[in-house]
Curated annotation (Swiss-Prot):
Protein name: Ubiquitin carboxyl-terminal hydrolase UCHL3
Chain spans, region Crossover loop which restricts access of large ubiquitin adducts to the active site: 151-159
EC number: 3.4.19.12
One Pfam family it belongs to: Peptidase_C12
Record organism: Plasmodium falciparum (isolate 3D7)
Gene name linked to the record: UCHL3
Family: Belongs to the peptidase C12 family.
Role, per record: Thiol protease that recognizes and hydrolyzes a peptide bond at the C-terminal glycine of either ubiquitin or NEDD8. Essential for parasite blood stage survival.
Amino acid sequence: MAKNDIWTPLESNPDSLYLYSCKLGQSKLKFVDIYGFNNDLLDMIPQPVQAVIFLYPVNDNIVSENNTNDKHNLKENFDNVWFIKQYIPNSCGTIALLHLYGNLRNKFELDKDSVLDDFFNKVNEMSAEKRGQELKNNKSIENLHHEFCGQVENRDDILDVDTHFIVFVQIEGKIIELDGRKDHPTVHCFTNGDNFLYDTGKIIQDKFIEKCKDDLRFSALAVIPNDNFDII
């Protein structure tokens, strides 16, 4: 469970995240590992890709790059983007999933009366900040998070986590980066369904991986429809 309101971080594990999603109330999506961002490796990923979840090491180069991007997004209209602020340390994995679910609800319905269904109904008209505060009080999500979180040998290790989850989604023909530490979403570029994965891969390569050449603690997951469900 949480220690001093600090959660134990999730792992970038497709099977674990799928089981976590099912218990939360979204069984129509699944996750597959992305092993690299050259076209040959991306060609192996089943289409259509709905989103990309990305885990990366936090460092000054990336923070500086992202701060620059943020300034370019101040005039964007984000009324059509579901967003939540992160206030709980190490909750970024769950925040990324909430961003995923919130922006794909029109295509992949949540299980009725599930934990997610109840949460989204409650926070639907709230600001991103109030949604983040509401998550702090949601014991159902917290308990499920810790049912599927990573294992740590020393509980004090959860204080020193320096990796972070974000998610990339396509909304109205644009690639949107959703990061709960930021004040608003980040718009990167125009794309389309066929090119979304490849365009997102280039963003990740240029704006994240190239900034951390000495630290290879990266992990990426493609989000695709579960074989048992059709897209609405």
